[in-house]
């Protein structure tokens, strides 16, 4: 039952992402992110954030976020209302008391996040979020997630 509620929350978040960011992507030119200082992850995409709490990744991710994501999601991930407030991305997980369920929730959110960033969000032919696959490498995507985890509204 709880898993079904989690899936519904993820779907609601995806719908909110699509509905609130119709004009969000604007004309941003994605910026390259230097990830040479990070452990390289290879070609196979990870299911979970391998850089969680990695200080170097958080620093790189913060810079990458401000260069590539802030125009829509707000400086330091504080949304101005155009696109979803990414500080709330893991809120559902934070409210869980059971550590096993919390861990599963965080894992599902990592998968959702990576998919949204890589493939973007399109509905009825309208782009709500541009895809970043091919622009941001895996290391950059996970470094941004590591940064976002430091900006959470509710700590895990």
Regions found by a protein language model. Name each.
Residues 55, 59, 63, 107, ...:
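Soluble non-cytosolic domains of exported or imported proteins
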Residues 60-62, 78-118, 128:
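Gly/Gly-Pro-rich "capping" loops immediately C-terminal to redox-active cysteine motifs
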Residues 25-32, 51, 80-89, 116-152, ...:
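Axial heme c-ligation environment in periplasmic c-type cytochrome domains
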Residues 61, 65-75, 129, 144-148:
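The canonical Cys-X-X-Cys-His
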Residues 19-21:
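N-terminal signal peptide c-region/cleavage motif recognized by signal peptidases
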Residues 30-64:
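Electrostatic cytochrome c docking/interface patches
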Residues 15-16:
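Short, linear, compositionally biased motifs with a strong N-terminal bias
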Residues 1-10:
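Bacterial N-terminal signal peptides that target proteins for export
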């Amino acid at each position: 039952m709880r898993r079904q509620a989690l899936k519904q929350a993820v779907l609601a978040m995806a719908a909110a992402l699509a509905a609130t960011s119709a004009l969000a992507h604007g004309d941003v030119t994605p910026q390259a992110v230097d990830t040479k200082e990070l452990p390289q992850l290879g070609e196979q995409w990870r299911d979970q954030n391998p850089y969680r709490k990695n200080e170097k990744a958080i620093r790189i991710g913060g810079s990458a976020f401000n260069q590539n994501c802030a125009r829509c999601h707000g400086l330091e991930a504080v949304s101005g209302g155009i696109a979803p407030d990414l500080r709330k991305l893991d809120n559902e997980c934070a409210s869980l008391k059971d550590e096993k369920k919390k861990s599963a929730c965080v894992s599902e959110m990592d998968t959702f996040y990576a998919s949204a960033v890589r493939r973007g969000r399109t509905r009825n032919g309208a782009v709500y979020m541009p895809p970043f696959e091919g622009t941001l490498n895996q290391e950059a995507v996970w470094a941004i997630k590591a940064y976002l985890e430091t900006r959470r509204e509710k700590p895990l």
